[in-house]
Amino acid sequence: MKNQINSYAQARISFYEASLQRKNTPQLVDEFNQLAQSRGWTAERSYFSTALIYEMLHRDIDISAIAIWDNEKEKIHSLHYTQVRLDEVAKSLVTLS
């Protein structure tokens, strides 16, 4: 898992542009909710964290990393679509590993 998270962080969470393009796509949210329900997770999160989790799932990165960060830091809900914030997420993922 550590290697997966580090690789993901080094890529500076490159899904940024893709998640912006998907911003108004109800199918993304529906698909995420189905995945979340099948794994027993609640989907009561902001769009940003939903997109982040969605991409982590599709890249086979352990969801527990972001879930821990979300619960302990309670910071992800206020993230904005900026590279600076995305880099902070990447650094936090590396720290968790």
Protein language model annotation of sequence segments:
Residues 2-97:
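Extended, charge-rich alpha-helical interface modules
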